[in-house]
């Protein structure tokens, strides 16, 4: 594998993971903010809100896991390299 191609692959993997992690962080923060506001407005619905929040956070976190899998494929089994 060419060293410049390896360097560009590592750079692409790092940028991709950074974007995915930033998106997940923003999404989780917005979800938590909405859950806190909902619980503050209606404390009796706290249990339902918590279940929905946990499910939503799991879906948001799956984006980072998918990005990690793609980055690992790029780094260790790069289909673009000969």
UniProtKB/Swiss-Prot annotation:
PROSITE patterns assigned: ATPASE_C
Per UniProt, which keywords does this protein have? ATP synthesis, Cell inner membrane, Cell membrane, CF(0), Hydrogen ion transport, Ion transport, Lipid-binding, Membrane, Transmembrane, Transmembrane helix, Transport
For the site labelled Reversibly protonated during proton transport, the residues are 61
Under Pfam families, the record lists: ATP-synt_C
Assigned GO CC terms: plasma membrane; proton-transporting ATP synthase complex; proton-transporting two-sector ATPase complex, proton-transporting domain
Cellular location of this protein?
Cell inner membrane
In terms of InterPro entries, this protein maps to: ATP_synth_csu_bac/chlpt, ATP_synth_F0_csu, ATP_synth_F0_csu_DDCD_BS, ATPase_proteolipid_c-like_dom, F/V-ATP_Csub_sf
Source superkingdom = Bacteria
Membrane-spanning parts: 6-26, 49-69
State if Ion transport is listed as a keyword.
yes
Annotated membrane topology: Multi-pass membrane protein
Q: Which Gene3D superfamilies match?
A: lithium bound rotor ring of v- atpase
Main localization, broad class: membrane
Give a yes or no for keyword Iron in this entry.
no
GO terms of molecular function = lipid binding; proton-transporting ATP synthase activity, rotational mechanism
| HAMAP family, A to Z | ATP_synth_c_bact
The protein's role, per its UniProt record: F(1)F(0) ATP synthase produces ATP from ADP in the presence of a proton or sodium gradient. F-type ATPases consist of two structural domains, F(1) containing the extramembraneous catalytic core and F(0) containing the membrane proton channel, linked together by a central stalk and a peripheral stalk. During catalysis, ATP synthesis in the catalytic domain of F(1) is coupled via a rotary mechanism of the central stalk subunits to proton translocation. Key component of the F(0) channel; it plays a direct role in translocation across the membrane. A homomeric c-ring of between 10-14 subunits forms the central stalk rotor element with the F(1) delta and epsilon subunits.
* Similarity field: Belongs to the ATPase C chain family.
Subunit structure as annotated in this protein's UniProt entry: F-type ATPases have 2 components, F(1) - the catalytic core - and F(0) - the membrane proton channel. F(1) has five subunits: alpha(3), beta(3), gamma(1), delta(1), epsilon(1). F(0) has three main subunits: a(1), b(2) and c(10-14). The alpha and beta chains form an alternating ring which encloses part of the gamma chain. F(1) is attached to F(0) by a central stalk formed by the gamma and epsilon chains, while a peripheral stalk is formed by the delta and b chains.
Q: What is this protein called?
A: ATP synthase subunit c
């Amino acid at each position: 594998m060419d060293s410049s191609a390896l360097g560009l692959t590592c750079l692409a993997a790092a940028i991709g993971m950074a974007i995915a992690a930033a998106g997940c962080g923003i999404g989780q923060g917005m979800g938590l903010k909405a859950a806190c506001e909902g619980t503050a407005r209606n404390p009796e619905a706290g249990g339902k809100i918590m279940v929905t929040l946990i499910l939503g956070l799991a879906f948001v976190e799956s984006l980072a896991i998918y990005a990690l899998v793609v980055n690992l494929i790029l780094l260790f089994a790069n289909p673009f390299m000969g």
